[in-house]
Regions:
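Conserved acetyl-CoA-binding loop-helix of GNAT-fold acetyltransferases
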Residues: 129-142, 166, 170
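Acyl-donor-binding surface of acyltransferase catalytic domains
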Residues: 4-14, 19-40
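Conserved acetyl-CoA-binding loop of GNAT-fold acetyltransferases
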Residues: 169-178
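Conserved beta-strand-loop-alpha-helix junction that forms the acyl-donor binding cleft
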Residues: 154-165, 181-183
Length: 189
């Protein structure tokens, strides 16, 4: 059984840090499928958040550069989403080949208008530029295709995030002819 206990940082319009506690437990089918099909490579391995140490790392210690903050939601958002919809969300920590925590990824099953998978991830600023982002994306693709090879993967990115766009195209995604709000959508089938 996975135990979630997290303090989510929320900032109001006066930039006051407000802590919200979420405590719950779950063991959903999607989590079970992800755990059975997790893929690793020579640079990274991915593990669902199963203890407070990983949870604390994901929501408090794992940091990105200030220039990247506009591109990703904080881990606390994904952990909160998993609490509200545990059947379709699996937050995880990314480890490098030296067993050090180096990032955060959250797998998501899309069940609304289009069926498919999605993920959101980032590498800690202290471990960037070491090919860990690409290695994580490759492992994520393999993991999700092992869960269901017929399910497409939909990723979104800001229109000015050219680095993510190049990565997605190099990994076999194609740019969709529709947007998600203002964001570009990439599809891996």
């Amino acid at each position: 059984m996975i135990i979630q206990a997290v303090n989510i940082s929320v900032f109001d319009n006066k930039n006051t840090n407000i802590k919200i506690a979420i405590i719950g437990d779950y063991m959903g089918k999607f989590l079970s499928e992800i755990k059975q099909n997790l893929s690793s490579n020579s640079l990274v391995w991915i593990k669902p958040i199963e203890d407070e140490t990983d949870l604390w790392y994901a929501v408090e210690e794992c940091k990105i550069t200030s220039g990247q903050m506009e591109y990703v939601n904080p881990a606390s958002f994904s952990v909160g989403r998993a609490y509200l919809d545990p059947e379709n969300n699996v937050p995880c920590v990314i480890y490098n080949n030296e067993n050090k925590r180096v990032g955060f990824i959250s797998f998501r099953k899309i069940v609304l208008n289009k069926k498919g998978f999605n993920w959101s991830f980032y590498i800690d600023k202290n471990y960037q530029n070491k090919d860990l982002g690409r290695a994580t994306a490759e492992s994520a693709i393999k993991t999700l295709k092992n869960v269901d090879s017929n399910m497409p993967i939909f990723l979104t990115t800001e229109q000015n995030n050219e680095l993510a766009q190049r990565l997605y195209i190099n990994l076999g995604f194609r740019k969709a002819d529709f947007l998600d709000g203002d964001d570009l959508v990439f599809i891996h089938e």
